[in-house]
Amino acid sequence: LQEVLKHENDTIEGKRLAISGYGNVGWGIMKKAAMLGAKVTYFAGPDGYVHDPDGVITDEKLNFILEMRAKDPMHCKPYADKFGCEFVPGAKCWGVKDVDVYMPAATQNDVKMESAEKIAASGVKYYIEVANMPTTNDALNYLREQKHMIVAPSKAVNAGGVGVSGLEMSQNSERLSWSAEEVDAQLH
């Protein structure tokens, strides 16, 4: 995301993100966004989606999500109940208008044509695929045709994961242990 924003002479500071999923990838997005001055204001699970206008930016909220998904990974409603946020049952957050970036981070083929049309109509500029192939081919082609949007496909976005795997192999062979900051520095 940062590289896409940099290419567009933009920054992550103050950006509002909508994501699907709150597993390892989604939770990592929430944490990294908060560290960089952005915030996840919408996140979806199998039971619906949560709208937290303040964002998932505190350790309390991030830790609660870890606990919540460990107890019951199929329901994100407990987050809304605990923090007094809006919960929309049985729906996805694709199409909400008060975000800057959409990031599907849950599962393959999560975003189909109907959702892609809602995303495009929302006026959002950035669509960043984080899960492996989260968008159906027809929906991805449709989004890429939108002149107002920057679309980053999963194969490009996830290249860092392959790089980190290589770094892990190097660490293991040399019996080293790098901090998250050191891994980030190695990637850049």
Describe each model-derived feature in a short phrase.
Residues 1-98:
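Glycine-rich phosphate/diphosphate-binding loop of Rossmann-like nucleotide-binding domains
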Residues 16, 39-42, 100-101, 125-127, ...:
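Structural motif
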Residues 25-29, 110-114, 135-137, 159-162:
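Short glycine/serine/threonine-rich phosphate/pyrophosphate-binding segments
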Residues 30, 76, 115-119, 139-143:
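Short amphipathic alpha-helical segments and helix-helix/interface helices
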Residues 42-45, 87-89, 103-104, 128-130, ...:
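General beta-strand structural signal in soluble alpha/beta enzymes
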Residues 87-101, 109-126:
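Rossmann-fold NAD(P) dinucleotide-binding segment
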Residues 120-188:
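Adenosine-phosphate binding glycine-rich loop
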